Amino acid sequence: ASIGYFDTENGDRFHAVVETGAWNWQMGSQLQWLDGLEGRQLIHNDRTADSGGRYPGFGSVVIDVDSGERRTLPMPVYVVAPSSAWALCVDYRRLYVTHETIGYSEEGGPFALPLAPEDDGIWHMEVATGEARLLASYARLKAFHHRTSMDKAIHWVSHIEVNPSSSRILFLH
């Protein structure tokens, strides 16, 4: 998929910036402007050659649209805080299994997934450094107001949002 922007001050001219292989029907590549950073920077998800990352083969890319400078972050983003300081991240391969139109396929997949792992869920990633920490594991979400009917279900989240002051999040589980 081509990523770019329309210049509304120049006849709505489209400026292609980059191509991505991480795209889905409902959310595209999660392309977002980083309004909290200097200049005109955007972030989007992409496929990577990183086979040793948290989510092998997927990450995100920050691009300065004026200079063309790019840097890769180790996790794909779901939403970036309005401050542009951090992003919330999930496993798009899990989303592909649970809801194909909002996930990313992987070569040879989809593969079997743990139902509610302790070491995966919603991640908080610093946009400046790529450092990440797990905010809420699927195991914790499963245990919250536990329902036995969900014991054999694959747990996942969607509709993750950050409030305007970047101080709270919400999501559906």
Positions of predicted regions on the chain:
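A structural motif corresponding to the C-terminal end of an alpha-helix
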Residues: 121-132, 162-164
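Short strand-connecting beta-turns/loops that link adjacent beta-strands
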Residues: 10, 36-38, 128-129, 165
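Asp-box/WD-like beta-propeller blade repeats and closely related beta-sheet repeat scaffolds
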Residues: 18-121, 134-151
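Short loop/turn segments that connect beta-strands within beta-propeller blades
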Residues: 8-11, 64-68, 127-130
